[in-house]
Amino acid sequence: MASYSTNEFKGGLKVLIDGNPMVIVENEFVKPGKGQAFNRVKLKNLLNDRVVEKTFKSGESVEAADVEELTTVYSYFDGDSYVFMHPETFEQYMVSEEALGETKKWLKDQDEYQVILFNGQPISIIAPNFVNLEIIETDPGLKGDTAGTGGKPATLSTGAVVRVPLFVQTGEIIKVDTRTSTYVSRVKD
């Protein structure tokens, strides 16, 4: 199995720590005036999304995680798990609701998602940065009603709720940023 030295650490690198796959979020090289240099690293656990901070002595090695990212298409929900299919090999991946996490509110049939596999098992799903979804319920915007924030809540076809401008109506399709859960624009047909 491959390993990484501390001088190869950078954001996005996937490593194995105590048997858990982790991704490096932040890496800071520290060279004190006295003593050995070290790396202060923030790591995000890919299994439970917890962020931990660890320090590694300069020159130390860490095992690479057997993590694979695949582009897949969301197919359907079979009652227990969500089924994603690889578009070229047609291989299906069953993903539990726990592994899906917050991405569940952005699931739309036939959209592409990144499936993260650890030892061949799906452990998490990454939604695209932007999705186009239909508004199924929102209050009508009243003309001149801008005393508040200038926005209103809207329920989308997936069940997610986002704040939208007053001019947006039920039945319209909007573009949403999945990273921040915010309205971006209306989608023209």
Curated annotation (Swiss-Prot):
User: Cross-referenced SUPFAM superfamilies, in alphabetical order?
Assistant: Nucleic acid-binding proteins, Translation proteins SH3-like domain
What post-translational changes are documented for it?
Answer: May be beta-lysylated on the epsilon-amino group of Lys-34 by the combined action of EpmA and EpmB, and then hydroxylated on the C5 position of the same residue by EpmC (if this protein is present). Lysylation is critical for the stimulatory effect of EF-P on peptide-bond formation. The lysylation moiety may extend toward the peptidyltransferase center and stabilize the terminal 3-CCA end of the tRNA. Hydroxylation of the C5 position on Lys-34 may allow additional potential stabilizing hydrogen-bond interactions with the P-tRNA.
Which SMART domains does the protein's record reference? EFP, Elong-fact-P_C
- The answer to keyword Transmembrane helix applying to this record is no
For the modification N6-(3,6-diaminohexanoyl)-5-hydroxylysine, the affected residues are K34
Annotated pathway: Protein biosynthesis; polypeptide chain elongation
Alphabetically sorted, this entry's keywords are:
Cytoplasm, Elongation factor, Hydroxylation, Protein biosynthesis
Question: Organism's domain of life?
Answer: Bacteria
One MF term in the entry's GO annotations: translation elongation factor activity
User: What biological process terms from GO does the record include?
Assistant: peptide biosynthetic process
- What's a single GO CC term here? cytoplasm
Q: What is its main location?
A: cytoplasm
Compartment list: Cytoplasm
What family does the Swiss-Prot or TrEMBL record give for this protein? Belongs to the elongation factor P family.
Family matches, as PANTHER family: ELONGATION FACTOR P (PTHR30053), ELONGATION FACTOR P (EF-P) FAMILY PROTEIN (PTHR30053:SF12)
**What role is this protein assigned?**
Involved in peptide bond synthesis. Alleviates ribosome stalling that occurs when 3 or more consecutive Pro residues or the sequence PPG is present in a protein, possibly by augmenting the peptidyl transferase activity of the ribosome. Modification of Lys-34 is required for alleviation.
Its name, as the record gives it, is Elongation factor P
Species annotation: Francisella tularensis subsp. novicida (strain U112)
Upper taxonomic classification of the species? Bacteria, Pseudomonadati, Pseudomonadota, Gammaproteobacteria, Thiotrichales
